[in-house]
Amino acid sequence: MQCPSCQNTDSRVLESRAADAGRSVRRRRECLHCDFRFTTYERVETVPITVLKRNGNRETFNRSKILNGLTLACQKTGLEQDRLESMVNELELQLQQRSGREVNSAEIGEMVLDQLSEMSEVAYVRFASVYRDFRGVNDFVAALEGIHANKEQLAAVR
């Protein structure tokens, strides 16, 4: 590994540990030439996921778009940014584990809404209003009724 300070390629690993819920390895290194200490991360290279948009266009999956949408939807709800990042990590992992490399944006939106419904009704409605393109109050009422119906079904199962 090349030292960021002196560009020497000789370094030793001081410490290694799992990071990002076991999906990467964090290594603390020391340059054998200048004694500079630095951190590296090792991850499995993944095959890109293609998202099929509503208008028929295809684009590479961009986790930051999901995270930005979640951050906006979750403002002033008390949900921590770390929790949102974990949610996006889990979503990306689920997409990577699928056999196909192409996914509809609608499927991604529904996966996000499923997780939000358990975390915050306010965030759910905010995200759904943009994702499902709400046009009026009736759309908001229908979304809230859907949340409550799902909660009642879960309570009946338990």
UniProtKB/Swiss-Prot annotation:
Top-level lineage group: Bacteria
ATP-cone domain mapped to chain residues: 49-139
Biological process (GO), any one: negative regulation of DNA-templated transcription
Cofactor detail note: Binds 1 zinc ion.
One GO MF term: ATP binding
Zinc fingers, unnamed class: 3-34
Cofactor(s) required for function per UniProt: Zn(2+)
Record's keyword terms, sorted: ATP-binding, DNA-binding, Metal-binding, Nucleotide-binding, Repressor, Transcription, Transcription regulation, Zinc, Zinc-finger
Family annotation (PANTHER family): TRANSCRIPTIONAL REPRESSOR NRDR (PTHR30455:SF2)
Function: Negatively regulates transcription of bacterial ribonucleotide reductase nrd genes and operons by binding to NrdR-boxes.
NCBIfam families membership: transcriptional regulator NrdR
Family label: Belongs to the NrdR family.
The protein's name: Transcriptional repressor NrdR
Species annotation: Prochlorococcus marinus (strain MIT 9313)
Gene: nrdR
